[in-house]
Amino acid sequence: NCQSNDDGTLSDEEFKWLTMRAEGGFGLTMTCAAHVQAVGRGFPGQLGIFGDNQLDGLTRLASAIKSHDSIAVAQLHHAGMRSPHDLIEGPPVSASDDEETGSRALSTDEVKQVITDFISAAIRAERAGFDGVELHGAHGYLICQFLSSEINHRTDEYGGTLDNRARVLTEIIDGIRDNCASEFLLGVRLSPERFGMDL
């Protein structure tokens, strides 16, 4: 973490850090959290997977990991309300408005764009040569924020019941399955750590 370039492109430092794990014998090597939207950046030096300008570095990384007989997986991430204001140069976004963090609710169209961008990031990872992706739905980040009844107060199809609160996640999963090869690995990271959220 915190080693990539400001525009989300892979740095030599992060390339070395990750490929050392594969070279050391890890059966599976996963990137650190890679943000799928610029507004979803969670920390300085975060790897990005939201633009084709990042594709060359991702391709180089996937190839190097796999050259050591390690499975290459990209972790897809959106920080949501946990994005620092100064880092994204504006208010962070979330499932609903949140006074404590100063985050604003995504419109329904913006939610659909988040879903599209997660799917596009998975497609980009596949193009780069990764064997699969993991959706970061833990640690109070955006997917977790949608799942939380305490944070998600939406009245559209992405709020209310558990099925609706999980709709962002299930639509991302369905979109990846529809657009990537059947053998492309897909995992979801969930955590019992709730960061004060009721799920």
Regions found by a protein language model. Give the residues of each.
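Alpha-helix-loop-beta-strand connector modules within alpha/beta enzyme cores
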Residues: 46-73, 148-187
